[in-house]
């Protein structure tokens, strides 16, 4: 049988990994797919680099549209990234009747509804396992492996850059800026790391998982996004003393009135497996009503780890190449006409427990005023830690862990405490999740 012919748009880190793994493991992959899969055309602006990777195994061009226009190409793999030209090329590939594989979480989180609708209309597949958590097969697990379950919540470390930074801040006692420079030197962080450190990348991925888990359209514009740039080494140390680790988590949870969709630094009990995910590794916890809590762990990025997910999608499409469109697994797990209109909850309606760090004047009565404000907003205290002041020191840190409360109440309490003349610096607030 004639091999499935693949056109590759972009042959950087992931593209070269995809070509190399497919070439190296071709016999195994063919036995699993039931048919050969061959990358026969590659588009990259750096044609010399591309030619050095593929040799004479594929035709190299500088114009991506030449790949899409080639009637011999069955599947287009988009590895360019971003929202602009990548969206145009994906839509053109769909219009040309090509299946699409992409690792572009930003594109799908923002434009997924439009892209999936176009794919349904043309009877083609848009596959995106590589868009979330690199080599971890979390999309397939949510869409197929857990299909018997009512998913209750997902909590994931889905950005390796921020997890590396937080791990190093804890282990070496360094502040954020110093560790960011180290991460950039080691290649774990981009020259412009904004999407990573501000939580945007994790929010793109969490948006996609939320849509699949709860059968809703992708709604990135409803996500709450907070990064790690304001975290200090002191907060990580205090959290450890209280039995917690701080991780940047993507969280989505089913509630009676809507869906939580949020990314922010989070205190997690040290005893949880996910609290012990270190360096650039990723992990995703999923809680289903039948299966309970499951954990998926592995490399969230890297050439061959992400290529593993890209090729898994190529194999899936090869297997269903002759299947009727209505016999395929839906893009977002639920049938398109069964997607719910459940809203994303505003952040001030979300219930969390909190870590608060207040830098206060070392005076009598300060603590009583702070606890009185919390009590006035029906916020109860779970634990309290006060740093011993050095002799002659006029200020100290007060650390408070609260029980669950509504975010809106906490916002009002923080504003009231911040106005006290004895509170000497902006109050640090980090949400806490037990992940039971």
Where are these regions (language model features)?
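N-terminal glycine-/serine-/threonine-rich beta1-alpha1-beta2 phosphate-ribose binding loop
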Residues: 1-96
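General beta-strand structural signal in soluble alpha/beta enzymes
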Residues: 60-62, 69, 77-78, 101-103, ...
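Rossmann-fold NAD(P)-binding glycine/threonine-rich loop
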Residues: 85-96, 105-143
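A short hydrophobic/small-residue beta-strand
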Residues: 99-101, 381
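Rossmann-like NAD(P)H-binding beta-loop-alpha module
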Residues: 120-201, 208
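Substrate-binding/catalytic subdomain of NAD(P)-dependent oxidoreductase enzymes
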Residues: 178-276, 281-283, 302
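Low-complexity, glycine/alanine/valine/leucine- and proline-rich hydrophobic stretches
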Residues: 264-289, 303-304, 375-393
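A conserved regulatory-domain signal marking ACT and ACT-like small-molecule sensing domains
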Residues: 309, 314, 318-436
């Amino acid at each position: 049988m004639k091999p499935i012919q693949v056109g590759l748009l972009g042959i950087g880190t992931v593209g070269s990994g995809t070509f190399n793994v497919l070439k190296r493991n071709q016999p195994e992959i063919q036995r699993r797919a039931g048919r050969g899969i061959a990358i026969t055309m590659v588009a990259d602006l750096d044609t010399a680099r591309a030619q050095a990777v593929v040799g004479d195994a594929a035709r190299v061009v500088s114009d991506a549209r030449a790949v899409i226009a080639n009637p011999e190409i069955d599947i287009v793999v988009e590895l360019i990234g971003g929202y602009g030209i990548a969206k145009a090329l994906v839509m053109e590939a769909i219009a040309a009747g090509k299946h699409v594989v992409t690792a572009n979480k930003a594109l799908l989180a923002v434009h997924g509804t439009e892209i999936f609708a176009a794919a349904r209309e043309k009877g083609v597949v848009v596959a995106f396992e590589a868009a979330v958590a690199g080599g971890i097969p979390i999309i397939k697990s949510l869409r197929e492996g857990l299909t018997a379950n009512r998913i209750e919540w997902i909590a994931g470390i889905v950005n390796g850059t921020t997890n590396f930074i937080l791990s190093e801040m804890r282990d070496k006692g360094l502040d954020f800026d110093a560790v960011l420079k180290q991460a950039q030197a080691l290649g774990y962080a981009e020259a412009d790391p904004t999407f990573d450190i501000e939580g945007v990348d994790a929010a793109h991925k969490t948006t996609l998982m939320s849509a699949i888990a709860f059968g809703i359209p992708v709604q990135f514009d409803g996500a709450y996004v907070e990064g790690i740039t304001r975290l200090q080494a002191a907060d990580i140390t205090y959290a450890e003393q209280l039995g917690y680790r701080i991780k940047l988590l993507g969280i989505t949870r089913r509630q009676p009135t809507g869906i939580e969709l949020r990314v922010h630094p989070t205190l997690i009990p040290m005893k949880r497996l996910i609290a012990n995910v270190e360096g650039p590794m990723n992990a995703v916890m999923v809680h289903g009503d039948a299966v309970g809590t499951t954990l998926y762990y592995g490399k969230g990025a890297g050439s061959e780890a992400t290529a593993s997910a890209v090729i898994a999608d190529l194999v899936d499409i090869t297997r269903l190449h002759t299947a009727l469109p209505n016999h395929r697994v839906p893009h977002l797990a639920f049938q398109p006409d069964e997607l719910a209109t459940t809203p994303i909850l505003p952040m001030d309606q979300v219930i969390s427990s909190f870590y608060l760090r207040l830098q206060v004047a070392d005076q009598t009565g300060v603590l009583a005023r702070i606890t009185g404000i919390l009590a006035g907003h029906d916020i109860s205290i779970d634990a309290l830690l006060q740093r011993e002041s050095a002799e002659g020191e006029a200020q100290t840190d007060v650390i408070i862990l609260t029980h669950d409360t509504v975010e809106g109440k906490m916002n009002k309490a923080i504003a009231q405490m911040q106005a006290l003349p004895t509170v000497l610096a902006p109050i640090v607030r980090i949400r806490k999740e037990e992940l039971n």
